[in-house]
Amino acid sequence: MSEKHIDEFSGVETTGHEWDGIRELNNPMPRWWVWTFYATIVWALGYAIAYPAIPMITDATKGMLGFSSRAELQQNLDQAKASQTTLHDLIAAKTVHEIDSDSALREFAIAGGASAFKVNCATCHGSGASGGPGFPNLNDDDWLWGGDLDAIQATIAHGIRFDGDTDTHASEMPPFAEVLDPLQTRQVAAYVWGLTNTPSDPGLAEAGKQVFVDNCAACHGDDAKGKAEMGAPDLADAIWLKARGEDAIIRQVAAPKHGVMPAWAGRLGDTTVKELTIFVHSLGGGT
């Protein structure tokens, strides 16, 4: 048995440990700390009795209060859903113009539309709606089918070139490889690129103007500004959906690529489509 050691200065027993002649006094813990520790033990026992706490083989103790975190969550969800019912009903009953003019409804619709956008639209258009190659940027003011509320709603509801919806936007640029010879294709590509950039060959671009007037102006307009009613893009704004440069234009003229957007009305319902419309319009590019 080790010999007890009493500190000669304080008269307090030491722990028996020594480091380079330094000994640790074995003072008792403060009484307030001890009673606090005992209180936490009592509180823990009371909690284990009152609430679900002790895991069993297939379940856990229920607790005397019958509390359930799942039931509490469901109650909170039901309360939140009930508080939103009135606003959802108003959105369902009003037009997108009426919703947009009501600040409270507009704010609620934007929040709902932002949530629906992340789940259904961000895969193609990006989480920030900035798009990518082949997928339009929804933040700018370049709209193939129009950027006002009615046009955006129609596009979301019925999609673009979507076979399952008879009201879908349906326009396709024909393949001009069967109409134009390779030289004419290079000429019109140089002309279109030259509308916003420096063409590789000014002579080709000059000759391409007449090729454009004869073959492209019917859809894109004499000024190449496009026509929303036909889904024909503006070629004079330096915004390119698929790729940039004369080579990319040559490929698109010869064998066009056409994107498809699903019709969302049948999947999401009219109310969510309206919320998406308000949200997309609020991004800054809506007209």
UniProtKB/Swiss-Prot annotation:
Heme c 2 binds at M173, C216, C219, H220. It comes from the Bacteria. Residues 58-287 are periplasmic. Its main location: membrane. Residues 1-36 are cytoplasmic. GO terms for molecular function: electron transfer activity; heme binding; iron ion binding; oxidoreductase activity. One of its GO terms (biological process) is oxidative phosphorylation. It is found in: Cell inner membrane. Keywords: Cell inner membrane, Cell membrane, Electron transport, Heme, Hydrogen ion transport, Ion transport, Iron, Membrane, Metal-binding, Oxidoreductase, Plasmid, Repeat, Respiratory chain, Transmembrane, Transmembrane helix, Transport. The keyword Repeat applies. The keyword Iron applies. It is a single-pass membrane protein. Residues 108-196, 203-284 form the Cytochrome c domain. Its cofactor is heme c. Coiled coil: none annotated. Pathway: Energy metabolism; oxidative phosphorylation. Component of the cbb3-type cytochrome c oxidase at least composed of FixN, FixO, FixQ and FixP. Belongs to the CcoP / FixP family. This is Cbb3-type cytochrome c oxidase subunit FixPc. It comes from Rhizobium leguminosarum bv. viciae.
